[in-house]
Amino acid sequence: MKWLSKSWAVAVVLLVGCAGRQEFIPPQPNAEEYAPPKLDYTLPDAQSGSLYRHQYTMTLFQDRRAYRVGDVLTVVLSEETSSSKKAGTKFGKSSAVNFAAPTIGTKKFDELGVSIDGSRNFDGSASSSQGNKLQGAITVTVHDVLPNGVLRISGEKWLRLNQGDEFIRLTGIVRVDDITRNNQVSSQRIADARITYAGRGALADSNAAGWLTQFFNSPWVPF
């Protein structure tokens, strides 16, 4: 009977560990939402008797910044955030109730006198801080030009290292006015930005918590 109860305890631990575990699916390169837009890159036929093609001409003083679907744009990553928070709570309460000893006639019953005292105190505090910093560059592609003229950009960069891969993915909306003459834009000037920097492989796996650690960190553990 004892071994049966132990078996049930082990089974419960395993089931709870599986319930609290979050499966991580490694990302794959060439995701459709980050791939360059599918365009027809073939040159249109020139007009009869002319070598001029209107859509593929460039004047001497033309702006070389990205502004069309399919153009490339370099995003300079300059992200740094920090946050801190502190909270404290403290309160106390005390009360006292006294019942005087009753007197009957001329006799006083001191043993029947009652005195009740009570006090309660609570003191709690908490603090947290977090900081992130990301610097680098990634060249993305213009996927769409919205009716108001802003550009919807998207792209990814993969780096194959010794023990795994690292990748940067970025999507967002950029104003043409924020693009410099060098066809660059700061990541701080991107609206609705989605920036992902992560990795996969041996190094990424070594930083992942095992199933037993995830069990003790899950909400199912009452301690």
Swiss-Prot record:
A lipid is attached at C18 (N-palmitoyl cysteine). Its main location: membrane. It comes from the Bacteria. GO terms for molecular function: cytoskeletal motor activity. Keywords: Bacterial flagellum, Cell outer membrane, Lipoprotein, Membrane, Palmitate, Signal. It is a lipid-anchor. InterPro entries: Flag_Lring. A lipid is attached at C18 (S-diacylglycerol cysteine). Residues 1-17 form the signal peptide. GO terms for biological process: bacterial-type flagellum-dependent cell motility. GO terms for cellular component: bacterial-type flagellum basal body, distal rod, L ring; cell outer membrane. It is found in: Cell outer membrane; Bacterial flagellum basal body. Belongs to the FlgH family. HAMAP family: FlgH. The basal body constitutes a major portion of the flagellar organelle and consists of four rings (L,P,S, and M) mounted on a central rod. Assembles around the rod to form the L-ring and probably protects the motor/basal body from shearing forces during rotation. This is Flagellar L-ring protein 2. It comes from Vibrio parahaemolyticus serotype O3:K6 (strain RIMD 2210633). The gene is flgH2.
